[in-house]
Curated annotation (Swiss-Prot):
Binds 3 Mg(2+) ions per subunit. It is an enzyme of class 6 (ligase). Homodimer. InterPro entries: Aa-tRNA-synt_II (IPR004364), aa-tRNA-synth_II (IPR006195), aa-tRNA-synth_II/BPL/LPL (IPR045864), KTSC_dom (IPR025309), Lys-tRNA-ligase_II (IPR002313), Lys-tRNA-ligase_II_bac/euk (IPR034762), Lys-tRNA-ligase_II_N (IPR044136), Lys-tRNA-synth_II_C (IPR018149). Signal peptide: none annotated. It comes from Nostoc sp. (strain PCC 7120 / SAG 25.82 / UTEX 2576). GO terms for cellular component: cytosol. This is Lysine--tRNA ligase. GO terms for molecular function: ATP binding; lysine-tRNA ligase activity; magnesium ion binding; tRNA binding. Pfam families: KTSC (PF13619), tRNA-synt_2 (PF00152), tRNA_anti-codon (PF01336). The keyword Magnesium applies.
Length: 561
């Protein structure tokens, strides 16, 4: 049967239930146990043994085996599964006053996917299956759409993300991933709160996007008649709180960056930023180790983990090594020895480092060498310390290494997991760096930061020495759940709508008809479309975006298929 036929048949069952006086969409149900509790409590029950303990349970029917006077359902709730042992005579006797044909209606009107409540006692069948020996049942929710027969496999990845609710129903391990994610974030908050850190919320809508080199999402406030940005970091507002007298603050929340999508990047992601007055990046390294090892031990019960086939030992202390030393270790290039930009460029080219020609400083080339030749090789936890000043506009100058800043990034399994500075507190130096960033922004660098005058004003009131830390929550969850893609740890990752890709189009100038074929197979014909619109569509860098903005809703149309 097609999905449409199945849905029609189930709608008919909904009507039959209503005719029987049964509401197929109940209001509530009182359970006494979850499946896992019953499995644990009665684990020692022997085959054929029954106890008279009355229980009530609810869940989704995941499997049905129906015989003449007997049926077996597999019921699944949030904690696991348990079998329902359904015997005609027992159910008919218990439910005689409610429904004289209760057992037959159970057989005829329920389907896999329905949500069922059941009351009864506990028994273990002769085959050893712990079961609820049902006396009464209630259909709590009638499912209209069938669950997929086969959901695993790469061919279904996009659908799993797009219909996460179905993914969660049929894949218990996916539910476990998000349960662990919740445990991880709760553990991080608990660790910090136990050390007197205070979580304070900062604005998501901001008049100046700052705190990171990233392209922001832009929106508009109608009442205030002003352009606003979704935050790309929480840094600058948390630092304002440090200026205001708080000594330990953090925020765990959503960040938005209008950038590419990959297995490691999602435009909307979660991070935590932590700031501590009178601390530096050495203190932040200790804090980072403490947070991650404590959470890993609490959630997984071990510091020895496996990620995509790689064994990772999270036992502290973690390696601490400078970017210069790592680049020298993996490429043989000693960037301390280069006296001129041309010398560094020549060495970089010979080492096969891409993008060297566009680099304007030795520090930029050093960073390119690190990203190209080193980053992916850092499998075990490694603090990469002391970065070039050119790529760290918010970090304090290194106290003993000119041209460098006191910054570290934590790499695990070849990915940046955390970023930290001894924060820049000199307002004059900070202004110079932000103005240099603003010049790049004016020249077309979409990721460069602007000048946040209010933040600079705050610094001029005086910010104490401060250590700052940012941890990517999604990447940390990926690590601790052995998830290959960031989309596996975000419940509802951003996806392009199905059918939004324009596969082909043609234009008939005599009738001004524009025919569009989408990747979903749908074909639409739009009428009285000026030639100029078709020409603009030809030249649009994103035809789907142009369609949604300038064609959809602007012209009359007819769907051909």
């Amino acid at each position: 049967m097609s999905e449409e036929d199945i849905r029609a048949a189930r709608l008919e069952k909904v009507e039959q239930l209503k005719q029987l006086g049964t509401n197929p969409y109940a209001y509530r149900w009182e359970s006494t146990h979850h499946a896992a509790q019953l499995q644990e409590k009665f684990a020692d029950l022997t085959s054929g043994e029954e106890v008279e303990t009355e229980v009530a349970i609810a869940g989704r029917i995941m499997a049905r085996r129906v015989f003449g006077k007997l049926a077996f359902f597999t019921l699944e709730d949030e904690t696991g599964t348990i079998q329902l042992y359904l015997e005609k005579n027992r159910i008919q006797e218990s439910m005689a006053e409610i429904d004289a044909n209760a057992f037959n209606h159970l057989k005829q009107l329920t389907d896999v996917g329905d949500i069922l409540g059941a009351k009864g006692t506990i028994k273990r069948t002769e085959k050893g299956e712990l079961s609820v020996y049902v006396k009464e049942y209630t259909i709590l929710t009638k499912s209209l759409l069938p669950l997929p027969d086969k959901w695993h496999g790469l061919t279904d990845v996009a659908k799993r993300y797009r219909q996460r609710y179905v993914d969660l129903i049929v894949n218990p391990e996916v539910r476990q991933t998000f349960r662990r994610r919740a445990q991880i974030t709760a553990g991080i908050r608990r660790y910090l709160e136990q050390r007197d850190f205070l979580e304070i919320e900062t604005p998501v809508l901001q008049s100046e996007a700052g705190g990171a080199d990233a392209r922001p999402f832009v929106t508009y406030h109608n009442t205030l008649e002003m352009e606003l940005y979704l935050r790309i970091a929480t840094e600058l507002h948390l630092k304002r709180l440090i200026v205001g007298g708080f000594e330990k603050v953090f925020e765990l929340g959503r960040i938005f960056r209008n950038e590419g999508i990959s297995t490691r990047h999602n435009p909307e992601f979660t991070s935590i930023e932590v700031y501590q007055a009178y601390a530096d990046y050495n203190d932040m390294m200790a804090l980072t180790e403490g947070i991650i090892t404590t959470v890993a031990q609490d959630v997984l019960g071990t510091l020895q983990i496996t990620y995509q086939g790689e064994t990772v030992d999270l036992t502290p202390p973690w390696r601490r090594v400078t970017m210069h030393d790592l680049v020298k270790e993996y490429t043989g290039l000693d960037f301390h020895s280069f006296q001129t930009l041309e010398e560094a460029k020549s060495a970089g080219k010979n080492a096969g480092i891409p993008g060297v020609d566009e680099a304007q400083t030795i520090g930029k080339i050093l960073n390119l060498a690190f990203e190209e030749k080193v980053e992916t090789k850092l499998i075990q936890p490694t603090f990469v310390i002391d970065y070039p000043v050119e790529i760290s506009p918010l970090a304090k100058p290194h106290r003993s290494q000119p041209g460098l800043v006191e910054r570290f990034e934590l790499f695990i399994v070849g990915r940046e997991t955390a970023n930290s500075f001894s924060e820049l507190t000199d307002p004059i130096d900070q202004r110079e760096r932000l103005e240099a960033q603003a010049a790049k922004k004016a020249a077309g660098d979409l990721e460069a930061q602007g000048v946040d005058e209010d933040f600079l004003t705050a610094l001029e009131y005086g910010m104490p020495p401060t250590g700052g830390l940012g941890i990517g929550i999604d990447r940390l969850v990926m690590l601790l759940t052995d998830s290959a893609s960031i989309r596996d740890v975000i419940a509802f990752p951003l996806l392009k709508p199905e059918g939004s890709f324009i596969k082909a189009y043609r234009y008939e100038p005599t009738t001004q008809t524009l025919t569009l074929e989408f990747d979903s197979g749908s074909i639409y014909e739009y009428f009285k479309v000026p030639l100029t619109v078709k020409e603009e569509l030809d030249n649009a860098p994103s035809k789907g975006q142009y369609f949604h903005k300038f064609i959809k809703g602007q012209f009359k149309y007819e769907q051909l298929s």
